[in-house]
């Protein structure tokens, strides 16, 4: 983990009257959470881009078959359940191991299982991967918010909360760009085009390398 000193509690120390007064450690915590939420937004919408054609491919039926809509919905429902459970699960881990360490685990979780979705051969394998990836996404929302609440001054929390929401929207935009690229590839080869969208979800794992090196634990933890 980071060799940086622990981030001073948000409720102690010199009063912060402007963003320039924030410490480097506080900025790093904010950037880590922001990037985590950005990749959350990206990952959440990757599946929706290819749900119909990919599930049809897994079921070996046409895209207009009623089974495609049914199993696509089941997979999405499993994702939402995982998202709901992830906050409590990784929130508890954050209490035990620390916020920055838990943040690393959440990002690795959704990056790993999003990437593994590429190899799914049945609808239930895809559902399992999406459920496990959602645990990481739900956990990242909770852990990232906790990290900021323990490191950023109270007066700046509404501002950083709004900024985190912008990260999600940018992530969704990146997912749309990915969808355009996939549609271009699919025009020439559909065999792997719809699967390949999930490989983009591996990218957040690179963020872990920086978090482990640069983001310290909150002092109060």
Question: Residue locations for each model-derived region?
Answer:
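Transmembrane-helix signature of 12-pass secondary carriers
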Residues: 1-221
């Amino acid at each position: 983990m980071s060799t940086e000193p622990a981030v001073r509690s948000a409720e102690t120390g010199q009063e912060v009257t402007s963003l320039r007064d924030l410490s480097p450690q506080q900025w790093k915590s904010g950037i880590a959470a922001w990037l985590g939420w950005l990749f959350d937004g990206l990952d959440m919408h990757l599946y929706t881009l290819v749900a119909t054609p990919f599930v049809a491919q897994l079921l070996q039926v046409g895209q207009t078959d009623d089974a495609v809509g049914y199993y696509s919905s089941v997979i999405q429902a499993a994702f939402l359940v995982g998202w709901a459970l992830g906050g409590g699960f990784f929130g508890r881990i954050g209490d035990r191991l620390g916020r920055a360490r838990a943040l690393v685990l959440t990002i690795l979780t959704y990056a790993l299982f999003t990437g593994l979705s590429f190899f799914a051969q049945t609808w239930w394998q895809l559902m399992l991967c999406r459920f496990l990836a959602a645990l990481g996404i739900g956990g990242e929302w909770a852990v990232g918010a906790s990290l900021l609440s323990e490191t950023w001054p109270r007066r700046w929390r509404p501002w950083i909360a709004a900024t985190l929401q912008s990260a999600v929207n940018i992530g969704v935009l990146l997912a749309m760009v990915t969808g355009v690229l996939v549609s271009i590839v699919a025009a020439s080869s559909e065999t792997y085009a719809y699967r390949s969208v999930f490989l983009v979800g591996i990218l957040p794992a690179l963020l872990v390398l920086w978090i482990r090196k640069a983001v310290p634990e909150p002092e109060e933890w």
